[in-house]
Amino acid sequence: RIMSSIVAIVGRPNVGKSTLFNRLIQRQDAIVDSQSGVTRDRHYGFSFWNGKDFTVIDTGGYMLGGEDNFEKEINHQVIIAVEESDIIIFTVDVETGLNSMDNEISKLLHKSGKQVVLAVNKVDNSKRIIDTSEFFKLGFENSFNISAINGSGTGELLDKIVQFIPDKKNIDNDNLPGFAVVGRPNAGKSS
């Protein structure tokens, strides 16, 4: 059996996480809306790039100090995704710029000890390329300017992600549980 690496897409509300998720899995699986809070639970899909496959998790937008139960549950789902992932795509929005929520999420991700790739989203013109420099303050080594909606920069982002994914290794079959099908003669064991 082969285990797949897990990549979580994390960020504050409305930065384009679900659009990026749909682009990475090459399907329109996640609902995309300009209204905040559309993605609530973790949403899973599968992706393949340069000979490596991996699971992608779309998460709801992390809310700084989420007050109501709804926001607290979304934040809890984001924390679970961070814990179960091997690699995190921290998605930020160049249109709205760096804010306190980005800083708080950044601290959370630095503490996680996971590989984090920063995706500065909505970079679809030269003016916005200049605006991306403020995100260097977040302190992530791997940063990519992307446009999830039109796909620019996502190839380079994926190239970096798959560098963190180990080559497939078979799990030791000695550690897998054994089982037997038992029963009376002609009871349908072979079926």
Label each PLM-derived region with a short phrase.
Residues 114-117, 122-178:
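Canonical P-loop GTPase G-domain recognition
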Residues 1-2, 17, 127, 132:
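Polar low-complexity intrinsically disordered regions
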Residues 2-71, 80-81, 92, 163-191:
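Conserved G1/Walker A P-loop phosphate-binding module
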Residues 36-38, 61-63, 95-97, 122-126, ...:
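Conserved nucleotide-binding/hydrolysis micro-motifs of P-loop NTPases
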Residues 73-142:
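Conserved C-terminal guanine-recognition region of P-loop GTPase G domains, centered on the G4
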